[in-house]
Regions:
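Absolute protein N-terminus
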Residues: 1, 25-29, 114
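Bacterial N-terminal signal peptides that target proteins for export
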Residues: 2-12
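Short hydrophobic/aromatic-rich motifs at helix boundaries and adjacent loops
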Residues: 12, 50-52, 77-78
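Electrostatic cytochrome c docking/interface patches
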Residues: 18-36, 74
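Periplasmic/extracellular electron-transfer cofactor-ligation site
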Residues: 30, 34-61, 87-91, 111-114
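Axial heme c-ligation environment in periplasmic c-type cytochrome domains
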Residues: 57-65, 69, 78, 82-113
Length: 114
């Protein structure tokens, strides 16, 4: 029979593994984000994140530079909202991307500013 101390250890180990697995599942992967960015974002935001001038002119938009200090200063949840819901002439991607893909593309976007 297992004593109370052993039961507590088993329970705590299970909790720690659950938390660790959850953290791993939701950690952002910039490399995976690049693939999504290249597929959905690069035509407007450019390979370097500074925006595509021709596309900006065609759309009449100025906010295509995702590495700009004011964009990078925004909190993740603010930027994820734009990715999911769209903004201005930027289409919403929420229906096309999983939550993991959304976080990955945001991670890649952040990496462009470094």
């Amino acid at each position: 029979m297992i004593n109370g101390k052993t039961q507590l250890r088993v329970l705590m180990s299970g909790c720690l593994l659950t938390v660790a697995a959850g953290s791993y599942a939701w950690s952002a992967d910039a490399k995976a984000g690049k693939a999504t960015y290249d597929k959905l974002c690069v035509s407007c935001h450019g390979a370097d994140g500074k925006g595509n001038p021709a596309m900006a002119k065609a759309l009449g938009e100025k906010g295509l530079n995702v590495v700009a200090k004011d964009v990078q200063a925004k909190k993740d949840d603010e930027l994820l909202k734009v990715i999911v819901e769209g903004a201005g002439k930027m289409p919403a991607s929420g229906k096309n991307l999983s939550q993991q893909e959304q976080k990955d593309v945001l991670s890649y976007m952040r990496s462009l500013a470094k």
